[in-house]
Amino acid sequence: MGKNTSFVLDEHYSAFIDGEIAAGRYRSASEVIRSALRLLEDRETQLRALREALEAGERSGSSTPFDFDGFLGRKRADASRGR
């Protein structure tokens, strides 16, 4: 069951909502707000995942140098041997 909540919007957001309804993208202000909240929730979820990945990377310690030329040499050698 939904919860009735009221809030005050400034002219900018009020006009934006009215424009979305007039354009036929939404049927009501409630639909616009629900859509905006879904987007905000998705963004927060993505940011949380990014923060967790960054923290995991920091905990994994210092990186080691990568020898790209050596890597390519090994791959080419493997390819020539049919691996």
From Swiss-Prot:
Region (Disordered): 54-83
GO terms under biological process: detoxification; regulation of DNA-templated transcription
One Pfam family recorded for the sequence: ParD_antitoxin
Disulfide bonds: none
Coiled coil location: 33-60
CDD domains documented for this protein: RHH_NikR_HicB-like
GO molecular function per UniProt: toxin sequestering activity
Keywords: Coiled coil, Toxin-antitoxin system
InterPro entries: ParD (IPR022789), ParD_sf (IPR038296), Ribbon_hlx_hlx (IPR010985)
Function: Antitoxin component of a type II toxin-antitoxin (TA) system. Upon expression in E.coli neutralizes the effect of cognate toxin ParE1.
Family listed: Belongs to the ParD antitoxin family.
UniProt xrefs under NCBIfam families: antidote_CC2985
Protein name per UniProt: Antitoxin ParD1
Encoding gene per record: parD1
